[in-house]
């Protein structure tokens, strides 16, 4: 239990608080609508569907308030950089913003389903009462408001000949129209957010997600018509529903039971969402302002394995290791922004990203930069680029640990390029305040060509550490996870050479996948009383494996070895 609490304790606490608030709101509003005196006649008309519609509505307000906050990147980056208010543990929760965003989205979907189904029953009860297809009590309640100076309870006011006509009345009211629109928006947003769509058809995901604007507008005005009604406080003073409920035929005839008066609840949703919507509007204004700032592409480098490197400059741009930016290329798409990890170091006078060509947008950028041509491209022909960021990630905390494990899979090595470059610069500048004492670096890749663009950096580090008699500072293991028989024979022939046949490094390339259990146990034995940061940029399956290893290999004792798992999320 202690091992688990080291990595997941605070995250689970946050989730439990969030779930607890959802349960509290649901129960509180369910009991309010199911037991309070002012809703006695509304319950007579609608039954338990009233409370089952209003309780999830309260939870929807709460979760729609939360859904925008995890995607306010500038706000999160500001909080992350405020070390005075954010410890490492708190920052790790900020790094899980997208996970929380998805959880809130699924909670919204759940409560939307309950709310919609309950209101479909409510519409049926209201319509049946107006076509005289209900009990006499409901019909009598629905007739209130037909006479002058009376306020109505049933929102269906006209007499209806058949239930289908009543359904038409319901969906043509403001609440019905907005309900249909925001539900359709929610369905489209969620279905286009699956992993398959995001990876293979990112443009579909990107454009569909912007339906959130319509969703929030519809949500804000959804309750403006006030169709869910209750007995007014003034009416309750002269008409006690507990005493008069059984004497409906005497209403208006005896002094103690005058005709009850009803009013709709004032809309509340806008009060929940106006704050987050204002913050998100500020977020978008900041992004727009940044997108207008001039960015100059100083160099484009084509690497093997269909990877390009863009080196850029922008006035006032400041970065930290492991951060990422959003990039827009109007020549490819005027609206799309794509996230990329910075591969340059803060000490360099430019910032760079490495982009693997895997989709329509990256293919378009590849061609716009002239990388599909053999001749050099003139600088003035390079496309205009807009940059938003940089934004903080888990990798920023690398220098907060004495010992770290860096694990990159394929192109996922990019954030560690920035870290290792920064380490190299710090050693070149004789940095004395470097807390980091040991790096264990693991790189898993399927293809030998993918190693080429990164090998030069590792060679520089390897040489630098040897010259400073600190060769043990960096321990790196490169794994080739895909090879054929001819490659295996070639590797075997050159195995005894001083340098590796693939990378040119003294450290030989390993074949297959790491035995993570052995790796963690070995590192734990070498650093028995240390908090070790484990940083991953790679697939979910690997993240799950490493997270389990961090939990199982962390000591339950506060003074023992603790592996702290961190994963890149953007």
From Swiss-Prot:
Residues 2-9, 73-95, 195-203, 286-570 are cytoplasmic. GO terms for molecular function: FAD binding; metal ion binding; NADPH binding; superoxide-generating NAD(P)H oxidase activity; superoxide-generating NADPH oxidase activity. There is a cross-link at residues 161, 255, 294, 299, 306, 328, 334, 381, 506, 567 (Glycyl lysine isopeptide (Lys-Gly) (interchain with G-Cter in ubiquitin)). The chain crosses the membrane at residues 10-36, 47-72, 96-130, 164-194, 204-222, 268-285. Residues 79-219 form the Ferric oxidoreductase domain. Its EC number is 1.6.3.-. Its cofactor is FAD. The keyword Phosphoprotein applies. Heme b 1 binds at residues 101, 206, 209, 280, 287. Its main location: membrane. It catalyses: NADPH + 2 O2 = 2 superoxide + NADP(+) + H(+). PROSITE patterns: FAD_FR (PS51384). Heme b 2 binds at residues 115, 222, 226-227, 268. NADPH binds at residues 411, 446, 481, 513. The keyword Secreted does not apply. It is a multi-pass membrane protein. FAD binds at residues 199-200, 337-339, 341, 354, 356, 361-362. Component of the phagocyte NADPH oxidase core complex/cytochrome b558 complex, composed of CYBB (heavy chain (beta)) and CYBA (light chain (alpha)). Component of the phagocyte NADPH oxidase complex composed of an obligatory core heterodimer formed by the membrane proteins CYBA and CYBB and the cytosolic regulatory subunits NCF1/p47-phox, NCF2/p67-phox, NCF4/p40-phox and the small GTPase RAC1 or RAC2. Interacts with NCF1 (phosphorylated form). Interacts with NCF2; the interaction is enhanced in the presence of GBP7. Interacts with RAC2. Interacts with RAC1. This is NADPH oxidase 2.
């Amino acid at each position: 239990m202690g091992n688990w609490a080291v990595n997941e304790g605070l995250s689970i606490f946050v989730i439990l608080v969030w779930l607890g608030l959802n349960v509290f709101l649901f129960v509180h509003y369910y009991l309010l609508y199911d037991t309070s005196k002012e809703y006695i006649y509304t319950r007579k008309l609608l039954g338990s569907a009233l409370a089952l519609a209003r309780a999830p509505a309260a939870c929807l307000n709460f979760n729609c308030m939360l859904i925008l906050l995890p995607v306010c990147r500038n706000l999160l980056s500001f909080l992350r950089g405020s070390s005075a208010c954010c410890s490492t543990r708190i920052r790790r929760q900020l790094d899980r913003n997208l996970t929380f965003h998805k959880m809130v989205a699924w909670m919204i979907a759940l409560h939307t389903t309950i709310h919609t189904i309950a209101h479909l029953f409510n519409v049926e009860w209201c319509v049946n009462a107006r076509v005289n297809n209900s009990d006499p009590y409901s019909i009598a309640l629905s007739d209130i408001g037909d006479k002058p100076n009376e306020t109505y309870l049933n929102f269906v006011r006209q007499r209806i000949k058949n239930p289908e006509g009543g359904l038409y009345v319901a969906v043509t009211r403001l609440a019905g129209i907005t309900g249909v629109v925001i539900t359709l928006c929610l369905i489209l947003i969620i279905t286009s957010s699956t992993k398959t769509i995001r990876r293979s058809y990112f443009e579909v995901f990107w454009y569909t997600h912007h339906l959130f604007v319509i969703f929030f507008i519809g949500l804000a005005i959804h309750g403006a018509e006030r169709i869910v009604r209750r007995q007014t406080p003034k009416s309750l003073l002269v008409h006690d529903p507990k005493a008069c409920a059984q004497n409906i035929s005497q209403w208006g005839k005896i002094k103690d039971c005058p005709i009850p008066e009803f009013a709709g609840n004032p809309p509340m949703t806008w009060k929940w969402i106006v704050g987050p919507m204002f913050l998100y509007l500020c977020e978008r204004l900041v992004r727009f302002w940044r997108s207008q700032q001039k960015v100059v592409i100083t160099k484009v480098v084509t690497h093997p394995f269909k990877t390009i490197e863009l080196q850029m400059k922008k006035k006032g741009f400041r970065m930290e290791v492991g951060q990422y930016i959003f990039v827009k290329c109007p020549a490819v798409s005027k609206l799309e922004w794509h996230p990329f990890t910075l591969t340059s170091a803060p000490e360099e006078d430019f910032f760079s990203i490495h982009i693997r060509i895997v989709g329509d947008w990256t293919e378009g950028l590849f061609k716009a930069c002239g990388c599909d041509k053999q001749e050099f491209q003139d600088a003035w022909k390079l496309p205009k680029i807009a940059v938003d960021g940089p934004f903080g990630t888990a990798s920023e905390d690398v220098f907060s640990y004495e010992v770290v494990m860096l694990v990159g899979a394929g192109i996922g090595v990019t954030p560690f390029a920035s870290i290792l470059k920064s380490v190299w610069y710090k050693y070149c500048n004789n940095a004395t305040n470097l807390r980091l004492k040991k790096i264990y670096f693991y790189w898993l890749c399927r293809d030998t060509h993918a190693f080429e663009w990164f090998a030069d950096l590792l060679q520089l580090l390897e040489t630098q550490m040897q010259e400073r008699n600190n060769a043990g500072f960096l321990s790196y293991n490169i794994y080739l996870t895909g090879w054929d028989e001819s490659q295996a024979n070639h590797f075997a022939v050159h195995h005894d050479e001083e340098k590796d046949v693939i990378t040119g490094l003294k450290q030989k390339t390993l074949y297959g996948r790491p035995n993570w259990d052995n790796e963690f146990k070995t590192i734990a034995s070498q650093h028995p009383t240390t908090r070790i940061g484990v940083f991953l940029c790679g697939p979910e399956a690997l993240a799950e494996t490493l997270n389990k290893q961090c939990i199982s290999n962390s000591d339950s004792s506060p003074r023992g070895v603790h592996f702290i798992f961190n994963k890149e999320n953007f």
